[in-house]
Amino acid sequence: AWRDCARRALGSRDFGDLSTDRYGSDDPLLIDYICSNTLPRRGIHARPDEVLVTLGAQNALYIAVELLCRADRPAVTEEPGYPDIAETLRRSQSPVTFLPVDGLGLNPETLPDDTRLVMITPSHHIPTGSTMPLGRRQTLLNRAAAQDFVIVEDDYDFEMSYLGPSAPALKSLDTEGRVLYIGSFSKSLFPGLRIGYLVAPAPLIAKARELRTMLLRHPPGHLQRITAYFLAL
């Protein structure tokens, strides 16, 4: 099926899209699928200008950290946690606090008062596999509003829920635009695909697109189109 989608994407009908330098946009078919199918499954509703396609979740994490971290913006993440989040934060300008997690994930009540950024994996914590319950999620959002900080949610491995339905994304509870959401097709398709996405308010996505352009121009248009066709099967 993937081979058939690749052949289709190479056809004359798609040639105009594939021969276009999309540094200022992403494949419209892929963006439409993400907005109309992928995100609603997680309880998230976003416009096309609120989504950026990235080279996997790691690229999205790096872009988020580059845009949000400064010396005067202390960051918090989980301990233990996803090693790439920890390493990306260590390389940033922000002072970083690693908060121990319990069986329910990160406890929002333990956040330092000067927190300005929280990076977490609430739906499937790495490496414990725990899921942050609804009460803690709401407490975290309330703390974010009270302390005026931003949350980056890496929705790692949310599909791998064997004991019941996947918990709604933290972003689905966000009414103030404080949660940046990162997703990837690595688990649902295959790890080598390296197609992810970042969901955030449109002004921040515009800045993220500028940064992405300086880093790698854009993810290959042909790969984006094949992915869109494959997902729509």
Where are each of the predicted segments found?
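Conserved core of the PLP fold type I
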Residues: A6, G11-Q147, E159-M160, P165-E176, ...
